[in-house]
């Protein structure tokens, strides 16, 4: 409920899945939540004790869009070295390092599912590769002062009962300053 949404620390939010009896049966979250689950429940097996699935489409006309985030790289100098670095970072070889060491999802289709460190991340990569529509999380595309600042606190303020018009004005003001 409202109290839980406002008071439970982010990393503790999946805990209800693992109580006896469970306090919840589903938890919508990004794949990185696994790091919190693994730290708090080291005896649980990914893919056996907990798993992931795609939320069904609201309207088949619009498909089943995936919402996510991503790390972006940019070249600011048009040099041979910059081009070589960009090509390397896009290669399966480089992305296998990200997958194995950081638990990230590869965007290079030549990265084998066998290199993923656990079944959840491998399944998430498969889901991503089969997606017809992908959209970046809007808050991740906003300047930090907005996306992880006033937008985040504004949502919490709204859930706690603050007037929506006031919340939106606060977010818009910070966006005007950030952009």
Provide a role label for each language-model segment:
Residues 1-39:
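Extracytoplasmic ligand-binding clamshell segments of periplasmic binding protein
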Residues 1-11, 80, 84, 162-169, ...:
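Helix-loop-helix "hinge/cap" segment bordering the ligand-binding cleft or interdomain interface
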Residues 10, 25, 29, 74-81, ...:
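Extracytoplasmic/periplasmic, Sec-exported soluble proteins
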Residues 15, 83-90, 95-99, 152-156, ...:
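Non-transmembrane alpha-helical segments in soluble domains
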Residues 39-105:
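Extracytoplasmic/periplasmic substrate-recognition and gating elements
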Residues 121-122:
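Flexible, small/polar- and glycine-enriched "cap/hinge" segments at structural transition points
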Residues 129-179:
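Conserved C-terminal helix/tail region of periplasmic/extracytoplasmic solute-binding proteins
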């Amino acid at each position: 409920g409202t109290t839980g949404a406002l008071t439970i620390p982010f990393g503790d939010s999946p805990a209800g899945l693992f109580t006896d009896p469970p306090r919840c049966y589903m938890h919508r979250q990004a794949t990185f939540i696994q790091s919190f689950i693994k730290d708090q429940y080291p005896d649980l097996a990914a893919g056996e004790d907990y798993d992931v699935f795609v939320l069904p489409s609201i309207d088949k006309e619009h498909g089943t869009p995936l919402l996510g985030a991503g790390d972006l790289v940019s070249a600011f100098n048009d040099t041979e070295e910059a081009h070589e670095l960009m090509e390397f970072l896009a290669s399966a070889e480089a992305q296998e390092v990200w997958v194995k060491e950081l638990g990230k999802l590869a965007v290079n289709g030549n990265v084998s599912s066998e290199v993923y460190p656990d079944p959840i991340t491998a399944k998430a990569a498969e889901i991503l590769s089969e997606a017809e529509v992908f959209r970046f999380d809007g808050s991740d595309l906003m300047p930090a002062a907005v996306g992880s600042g006033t937008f985040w606190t504004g949502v919490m303020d709204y859930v706690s009962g603050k007037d929506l018009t006031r919340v939106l004005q606060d977010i818009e003001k910070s966006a005007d300053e950030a952009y």
